[in-house]
Amino acid sequence: MSNESLANLLKEERRFAPPADLAANANVTAEAYEQAKADRLGFWAEQARRLTWATEPTETLDWSNPPFAKWFKDGKLNVAYNCVDRHVEAGHGDRVAIHFEGEPGDSRAITYAELKDEVSKAANALTELGVQKGDRVAVYLPMIPEAVVAMLACARIGAAHSVVFGGFSADAIAARIKDADAKLVITADGGYRRGKPSALKPAVDDAVSRGDGVEKVLVVRRTGQEVAWTEGRDVWWHEITAKQSAEHTPEAFDAEHPLFILYTSGTTGKPKGILHTSGGYLTQTSYTHHAVFDLKPETDVYWCTADIGWVTGHSYITYGPLSNGATQVMYEGTPDTPHQGRFWEIVQKYGVTILYTAPTAIRTFMKWGDDIPAKFDLSSLRVLGSVGEPINPEAWIWYRKHIGGDRTPIVDTWWQTETGAMMISPLPGVTETKPGSAQRPLPGISATVVDDEAREVPNGGGGYLVLTEPWPSMLRTIWGDDQRFLDTYWSRFEGKYFAGDGAKKDEDGDIWLLGRVDDVMLVSGHNISTTEVESALVSHPSVAEAAVVGAADETTGQAIVAFVILRGTANAEDDNLVADLRNHVGTTLGPIAKPKRILPVAELPKTRSGKIMRRLLRDVAENRALGDVTTLTDSSVMDLIQSKLPAAPSED
């Protein structure tokens, strides 16, 4: 970005007060902000006491060697005990922990007592296979209960898990196994996806064959499909766990004992292994899940639609909800199998009260039409959440109206793999929400927006999002590469964590996320956020989803190029539509933000976690050979876009 701050073009006037009954009974009230402001470390010490410690910590934060934080360092706990055993001991063994819904329609309910037995058996099995405290275990599984059991079993014995998303290639698995030096891999024959079995083990076999570090491969039977078998290395999960005792005494580990490594794609070079540890991570994931969703474990049914391969699945399927004794839904498959109402059918079936999903899913549901959710009873819902990227205001309003019946608060949560837990979000019983804004840092979190010179921007100004004080669930380093950790996150602004996201403050001082800094366009000397232009396009009734990039332009430096997916009724061949869309952006944001080219497309290139790969669209817009497409869900999407773009009309 240039020295001029990020343009603040989008004005949002709509406001939604918290429902009175929710506010009256909220887990967390406005007092929490004051309490945390008065004594931040005392506040986090109090949240740590929500957990069960074998040795209570006496020191909250050791920041003697910044940016390497140690939280609750003299405390000891077992993360799996906190997620399972303590609820059984408190008399909640019969409460359902997981309502599993398989894509083919099979389902099973697992109580906390059953989960404790499953985790104990798996922990005993891992020990029998030679896994010890401090070892690393790679996990490559579909969205089945064994994925959660495997993670908790690792945590129980003090082995760090490295979960690899079940859609990644053998190359990606091999790189992650090698970097973490994993000695065991847990996988499955396959999982169900889009109505048919999708094999997982072949990719593991390929990845493991490339190195000599992996001693055993533990295989869950899910689909029953044929698998290649390596005698002496491969072990069936059901066979080894069946013969284990359901008794396992969990050992207490230091609060700073590694809990997991989770790889996130670097913009360049090899993936970054984000290291999270035990005490601080569990303190913040547990507290934020309790606070932001207002979870009442006796009555709520919670559903986070993420995959456990992403940090959202780690923090808000496995650790946060289970530490709070929640009952949750876990769904294996895709939202349109066997029909486009599958999610709403699940909400209706289990009486889901809290739903946490991503803007990319919400925009897809918008594209499919309002009539689909209308067929189902969604009246059980009381809190809706959004995660993964900034949510366009129109998608926010659609989500509230068509899924939330115009009554549910929406918590738009900003956080990252690196932050470990939610950082900026409304509180459902406190905040007057604004469509499209994550609003303000949660109690105990210090975040602001700064300009190029690290000066805090005034209200109405834009720049870079930074975190100014350490937080309990922060990443401790990049696995095996402290220097890269320093260079990536701490070198840009001295003493501040740089998130890599653009942001603005509105006139009230609330924070709006504007996407990755790489997604800011410099048009005729103005910094314009792709997020704002995309939101303007999506606010047009004909547009379901939009991706915007800046392409090199001789006249303006960069020109705005937009790729749009139209709603069902709109016609891509309508010549007036492109002009109409261009004018709509001009009216909404100002003439400077009008796209030079707009191309209607059937699909957009997305990563497996649903994020739009704007980098590839930029390659197309600038007539370059495509960069790395290995994380794309469907690479044929790009061939179509490449063939169509040259013919797209351009505004002179």
Curated annotation (Swiss-Prot):
Position of the signal peptide: none
A GO cellular-component term linked to this record: cytosol
Listed InterPro entries: Ac_CoA_lig, ACAS_N, AMP-bd_C, AMP-bd_C_sf, AMP-binding_CS, AMP-dep_synth/lig_dom, ANL_N_sf
Highest taxon listed in the record's lineage: Bacteria
Post-translational modification as stated in the protein's UniProt record: Acetylated. Deacetylation by the SIR2-homolog deacetylase activates the enzyme.
Positions bound to Mg(2+): 538, 540, 543
Top class in the EC scheme: ligase
Annotated binding of CoA, by residue: 193-196, 312, 524
Pfam families in the record: ACAS_N, AMP-binding, AMP-binding_C
An example molecular function term from Gene Ontology annotations: ATP binding
Listed Gene3D superfamilies: 3.30.300.30, N-terminal domain of ligase-like
Catalytic activity: acetate + ATP + CoA = acetyl-CoA + AMP + diphosphate
Family matches, as PROSITE patterns: AMP_BINDING
Record PTM N6-acetyllysine, positions in chain: 611
Binding-site list for ATP: 388-390, 412-417, 501, 516
Biological process terms in GO annotation: acetyl-CoA biosynthetic process from acetate
Job description of the protein: Catalyzes the conversion of acetate into acetyl-CoA (AcCoA), an essential intermediate at the junction of anabolic and catabolic pathways. AcsA undergoes a two-step reaction. In the first half reaction, AcsA combines acetate with ATP to form acetyl-adenylate (AcAMP) intermediate. In the second half reaction, it can then transfer the acetyl group from AcAMP to the sulfhydryl group of CoA, forming the product AcCoA.
Stated family: Belongs to the ATP-dependent AMP-binding enzyme family.
Name of protein: Acetyl-coenzyme A synthetase
Species whose genome carries this gene: Streptomyces avermitilis (strain ATCC 31267 / DSM 46492 / JCM 5070 / NBRC 14893 / NCIMB 12804 / NRRL 8165 / MA-4680)
Organism taxonomic ancestry: Bacteria, Bacillati, Actinomycetota, Actinomycetes, Kitasatosporales
